């Protein structure tokens, strides 16, 4: 087994040059690394177990691996599969057609797989890095970041499949990552630290849509609506004070009046906030949102 830097001293470089593994580097730090090993399939009769551990230091990772290997593989497998089966049993039965069953179940499983185990409700956009083979060590973000827009759309997917608790969990995550002025970062690490620093107004509007959608479709799972009024109040206030123009649209990141942003921002999210806020602690802002600032043209008309 050997560990090395990708493109320099990794196992592929060894194999392509020597046609067998000849390197045995035991350490590689501060870079994009790859580990390569060789297993004697004859000696193990074709069966082997690989345990992979992570930690801040080598001893922590080693302890994780050792603890796992001491457990029964069959019991761990049964527990893991059982958790997935239990979750799927709670979803809507949309798989009556055998040909489409796997597509539905696989799709919702992909959504659930992208949720963090440490930051519940935090669902990254993708476990991939686009054009990964051409990326260097400095391209850390990729798509394994949280985009508030994609996160809300994932919550809509959960809700459509009947995973109401999962959708509400997403809202709780958004509640904890909202900026003081009411908006959300363009994208962020799971712990809420902003990555790209752009401002996309639709991403300040989408969480309001999620609150309203949950309010209408699963009020008992959402719980007391008053809990969310502060999130809605701040987001709606940000939209009213800064919209409808956006610093960036969702794809090309151009500034101006984006049709997509306009569709989400004043047409849907702001009236939705107007229905949520009155009677939930902010009648003045609720009135402002439903009637416009000074005149309806100040916010709702683009010429």
Tell me what each language-model feature is.
Residues 54-55, 160, 216, 302:
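Short, well-ordered loop/turn and helix-capping segments at boundaries between secondary-structure elements
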